[in-house]
Every structure is written in structure tokens, then in C-alpha cells.
């Protein structure tokens, strides 16, 4: 027996979410229709609203309801620093540290040739325009330390350095509160290589 066409369409739509396969999508659809129809309506309305009003900031490429997001519009930010991150969640994590007061650029992904994601897919043309605006003095690469993140950082650094822009990379090392005996050898080796002099 097959499910009604509208239910099948809902299941297929839910499968677009990361990590959601056919069984999970079917369970979600059953739950929303059987146990939380009100929640399903709120979800549908919220998704529709977000699709209508949320786009990308013209400067940092982060999600925003305005052409220029509040962070980019803030006069308190240091416009000489530009930190490049892969995703909006990375920007949010950096903001939570309350230590960085510069500007951002969100790539909305990372280079991944195996997945068909090339330079055009991560807004590098927009990044180059931003980095060469005459205000930026240093670009900080804060991509993840994954194979794709490293490849992205390398590619972007080559593009920027060829244009005379100073580029730095966030450090790798031990996590705050971490104990050496519980750290993997790769992280420990990197922490030793990237050690700093004590002042």
C-alpha cells in the first residue's frame, strides 16, 4: 500500500534536510500529521516567512533581513580586519568568544571538487571585491581544519596574496580546559609546531 501523494511529497521534501534519509523523513511526516499538526503549521509558516524575508548581506554574505546586516552596519567594528568563515554557524561561534571585533565574510560552503563545489560556488568573486575595498588590511582565514577547509584556505590565501593582501590563519592546538593525555597526536603535534613565546 502506498501513502497518499501529498504525504509522499512531504516525505520527499523533508529528505532535503542534512542527515535525513527516507525512514527519518517518513517518521517526521507521520509525527507532524498525527501528533503535532499545529507545530507543522507553525513550521510551514515560519519556513515560508524566512524564504520571503531572509537573503544575504551585500557585504559579508551572511543571512540577513536587510541589504546590510547589523554587524556590517555597526560603526564599532574594525573594518581593517576581515575574517573568512565557511558557514553562518562559524561566524556565530566566533562572535560568542567576544574577542574578535572585525568584519566577516561567509563563504556559505567550502571547496569540494568531489562534491562538485568549485570556486564559483563559494562566492569568491564577492569575497575578492570585499577584500579589495581599500579598508581591509588583513584577512583571517577561519575555515575548518578538514581536508576541504584546508584546501579552501590554501586557495583563498593564494588568491588574496597575489593581490597584495596580508593573510593569516587561525591557529590549531589544544582546546581550552583540555588535558594533553586526551588529545589526539595530530592536534598535539600542531600545538607544538604553532607554539608562541611567553611574554
UniProtKB/Swiss-Prot annotation:
Coiled coil: none
Matches recorded under InterPro entries: DNA_Rcmb_RecR, Rcmb_RecR, Rcmb_RecR_Znf, TOPRIM_dom, TOPRIM_RecR
Gene Ontology BP terms: DNA recombination; DNA repair
GO terms assigned for molecular function: DNA binding; zinc ion binding
Alphabetically ordered keywords of this record: DNA damage, DNA recombination, DNA repair, Metal-binding, Zinc, Zinc-finger
C4-type zinc finger locations on the chain: 57-72
Domain Toprim, chain residue ranges per copy: 80-175
Function: May play a role in DNA repair. It seems to be involved in an RecBC-independent recombinational process of DNA repair. It may act with RecF and RecO.
Homology family: Belongs to the RecR family.
UniProt-recorded name of the protein: Recombination protein RecR
Organism in which the protein naturally occurs: Methylobacillus flagellatus (strain ATCC 51484 / DSM 6875 / VKM B-1610 / KT)
Gene: recR
Amino acid at each position: 500500500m502506498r501513502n497518499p501523494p501529498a504525504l509522499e511529497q512531504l516525505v520527499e521534501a523533508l529528505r532535503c534536510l542534512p542527515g535525513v534519509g527516507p525512514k527519518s523523513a517518513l517518521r517526521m511526516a507521520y509525527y507532524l500529521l498525527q501528533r503535532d499538526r499545529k507545530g507543522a503549521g507553525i513550521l510551514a509558516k515560519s519556513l515560508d516567512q524566512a524564504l520571503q524575508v531572509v537573503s544575504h548581506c551585500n557585504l559579508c554574505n551572511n543571512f540577513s533581513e536587510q541589504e546590510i546586516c547589523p554587524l556590517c552596519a555597526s560603526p564599532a567594528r574594525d573594518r581593517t580586519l576581515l575574517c573568512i568563515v565557511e558557514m553562518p554557524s562559524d561566524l556565530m561561534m566566533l562572535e560568542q568568544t567576544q574577542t574578535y571585533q572585525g568584519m566577516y565574510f561567509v563563504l556559505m560552503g567550502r571547496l569540494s571538487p568531489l562534491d562538485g563545489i568549485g570556486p564559483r560556488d563559494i562566492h569568491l568573486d564577492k569575497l575578492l571585491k570585499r577584500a579589495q575595498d581599500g579598508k581591509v588590511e588583513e584577512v583571517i582565514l577561519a575555515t575548518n581544519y578538514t581536508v576541504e577547509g584546508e584546501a579552501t584556505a590554501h586557495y583563498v590565501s593564494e588568491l588574496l596574496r597575489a593581490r597584495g593582501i596580508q593573510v593569516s590563519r587561525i591557529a590549531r592546538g589544544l582546546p581550552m580546559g583540555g588535558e594533553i593525555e586526551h588529545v589526539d597526536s595530530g592536534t598535539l603535534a600542531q600545538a607544538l609546531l604553532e607554539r608562541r613565546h611567553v611574554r
